[in-house]
Amino acid sequence: MKQNIRKLNYKITKSFHGLTIEAFLHRKRYTRGMISGLKKVKYVENGVTHYGIEKNGQWAFSIDSLAEGDLLSISFLEMEAEDSAAPYSLPLDIVYEDEDILLLNKPAGIPSHPSPGHYEGTLAGAASYYYKEIKGIQPFVCRMIHRLDLDTSGLLLLGKNKFSGSLLNQDMRAGRIERCYTAFCHGNPALAFENTTSPSSVSKENAKNSGNLGIPDSLPTSLKILPGLEKTGSILRISAPIQRVENEYMLREVHFQNGQEAVTNILSVEYFPEKHFSRIKLRLETGRTHQIRVHLSYIGCPLLGDSLYGGSAYTPYMERQALHSSSIEFFHPENGEKMQFEIPLPRDMQELL
């Protein structure tokens, strides 16, 4: 078995002369936790002992100073496997892979990660199997940068090591990773935004029909739009906080007083009047559990096939919610290059047309 090591080399230029190693690494977006972990790294490769931090081939401390022309070598070493993702033999549809990134096309019906009732047969387990049994690398820790629901298909991004996992997670939290979805939903979502003038507009009657939304009783009764809806040009924005339904494990709901911030942008709507459904493209600003499903249900346009949130199956072709992670944009953790990927719809969603 090969050791799971990620080594990065930095040639120090004049602009970084005089900085400590720690200060330099902070400029490269290394966190304190990452730097602290490097101090514990020690391994043997080709008969030579190496360390997590080396300057000009010698063990170095993070407080040591750098000079122009120095070669700083950083090594991340996986110490132990993630026990919750047991290796599982399952074909992987790899869209892109390099030293830091694994981008997969997830099929519907496969869990992204272990959870109650789905401890085996997960994509995380399949990735562990791929690296251990096929690539001969051990241990492997599956670092999913985002997740997809069991019956959602499409692009899923993984960081292959501590370095890429940390930087991609930073980007995810900062909103620098753009994920777009293609979906089919009942009705025409654009109708919910007619006459929308502000994201606080609300109809108490609509609110009652949509469940307990946590909307204050003091709001005017004359307004006729659900809260959290805003139209800017062609973009339809849903800003409606989401929380877990009390005494429910899976079910989520919109709740304006107690929910967590959740924002979904509908970028385009193609309505098919003869079929009474729409094909829509969406972009997430946040990543709450079931966010798209909850938000579309909230505006009265649940996903086709999403029985959990009110969407009955439309045709025999759809045995799941009609939701597909179709494109992703992010910056490569090592060189900052902008990465863009887009994949077509799976067959079951194509057959809806």
Predicted regions and their residues:
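RNA pseudouridine synthases
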Residues: 1-353
